[in-house]
Amino acid sequence: GGWQAQLAALCHAFRELAHLHPGAFLIFVTNEKWADNELSIHEAFFGVLRIAGFDDRKTVNASRQLLAYVESFAWGELTDWHRPYSAQERQELDQVLADGRYPVTKSLADVMTSTNADTEFRFGLNILLAGLETELGRT
């Protein structure tokens, strides 16, 4: 595939790595020191973006956005933010929404509480990749 497919594959692989080694991943995202494995991840993203035709600044910016997306999404999964609500959590949400101050949120409660992490991850990644395609067209 093209550069978009290569970046998508890297993002999916990074997310999968987080699930295979959650303890190490959580340490990785909170540690400020550079490690060889971290540099390898950056190198892979930089390489694809550079070959795609992004200039230096956009290569770095795009890589940071993609990595931040994967890190934040995987963090949410590993800390139980990206999962369907339990019956108790749904009941608590319904109670908070009962006073009518948040009608749009209330109308979306069924969707909000029955998330599918894989679908949401692909959705966000597709948006980022579409934005990068647009940005590359401006270069």
Question: Model regions: which residues?
Answer:
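A general structural signal for well-ordered secondary-structure junctions
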Residues: 24, 55, 72, 102-103
